[in-house]
């Protein structure tokens, strides 16, 4: 069955999650630099969350102990939950845009002063409108797809935690 893969190879599952996050980030960069879509502040926050999920999944994939696997998977759930929250908020703003389009310039200011912004400016620079839907696939916006991806990652983390805790 599908869930036995989580029991037999949890490190491989985490490595695949990390690779999937890198692929999603690469696609976001493609949309930004090749297609010409400008990311909004909420998109940038989702990128931060995706980078953190990729790093945590990658580090947890090489963990030797079951306790570290469970802890890393828990952190994966928290980070992807945060990313899902931001994506859900952006989706809500896209479905029900306010009369004055704003996605939180104070939030954007926090992002602009974050040290990682200086280290990787090309990835985390953007000024788009959070309520604007620039691109869709199968009727869903980028924020909708981002939400679904974060939820899927959180579910993978929850399954890993459950399966690993039962093995004790």
Curated annotation (Swiss-Prot):
GO biological process: protein folding
Periplasmic side: 31-48, 89-144
Topological category with respect to the lipid bilayer: Multi-pass membrane protein
Name of the protein described by the UniProt record: Disulfide bond formation protein B
Described function: Required for disulfide bond formation in some periplasmic proteins. Acts by oxidizing the DsbA protein.
One Gene Ontology molecular-function label: protein-disulfide reductase activity
Source organism per UniProt: Polaromonas sp. (strain JS666 / ATCC BAA-500)
Localisation: Cell inner membrane
PANTHER family the record matches: DISULFIDE BOND FORMATION PROTEIN B
Keywords recorded for this protein, A-Z: Cell inner membrane, Cell membrane, Chaperone, Disulfide bond, Electron transport, Membrane, Oxidoreductase, Redox-active center, Transmembrane, Transmembrane helix, Transport
Gene: dsbB
InterPro entries recorded: DiS_bond_form_DsbB/BdbC (IPR003752), Disulphide_bond_form_DsbB (IPR022920), DsbB (IPR050183), DsbB-like_sf (IPR023380)
Gene Ontology CC terms: plasma membrane
Membrane-crossing segments per the record: 14-30, 49-64, 71-88, 145-163
Segments in the Cytoplasmic topological domain: 1-13, 65-70, 164-168
Family according to the record: Belongs to the DsbB family.
The keyword Chaperone belongs to this UniProt entry's keyword annotation: yes
S-S bonds: 40-43, 103-130
